[in-house]
Amino acid sequence: MVSRKAVVVLLVVHAAAMLASHTEAFVPIFTYGELQRMQEKERNKGQKKSLSVQQASEELGPLDPSEPTKEEERVVIKLLAPVDIGIRMDSRQLEKYRATLERLLGQAPQSTQNQNAAK
């Protein structure tokens, strides 16, 4: 028969395995003090950035509100960049969504033509 020590060891190992499987296994890499120092450094960086932005805006003077800034122009360019979209369907899905796809594809050239006419 199995000794009591072996049974106890197996029970302890089993309990440890159960606890380990239910935890998120978070192991802190940094100490609490190190985390506080890093957060303080990040706050200082944020303050320096906001200060430099404020100084730059003071140097430029008042801007015309209707005139976009360089950052806004970059955002607009990124939003207007063409995007290719691909869809993979099997024959059953194609049969099911054929009417909707034909309607969408019929509308796509119209919206493209409207954008070109506006320019």
Swiss-Prot record:
PANTHER family per UniProt: MOTILIN, PROMOTILIN
GO molecular function, one term: motilin receptor binding
Signal peptide: 1-25
Organism encoding this protein: Sus scrofa (Pig)
Pfam families, sorted: Motilin_assoc (PF04643), Motilin_ghrelin (PF04644)
Similarity field: Belongs to the motilin family.
Lineage: Eukaryota, Metazoa, Chordata, Craniata, Vertebrata
Region spans: Disordered: 40-72
Gene that encodes the chain: MLN
Entry function: Plays an important role in the regulation of interdigestive gastrointestinal motility and indirectly causes rhythmic contraction of duodenal and colonic smooth muscle.
Subcellular location: Secreted
Protein name: Promotilin
GO cellular component terms attached to this protein's record: extracellular region
Primary subcellular site in the record, as a coarse category: secreted
Keywords: Cleavage on pair of basic residues, Hormone, Secreted, Signal
Family annotation (InterPro entries): Motilin_assoc (IPR006737), Motilin_ghrelin (IPR006738), Promotilin (IPR015662)
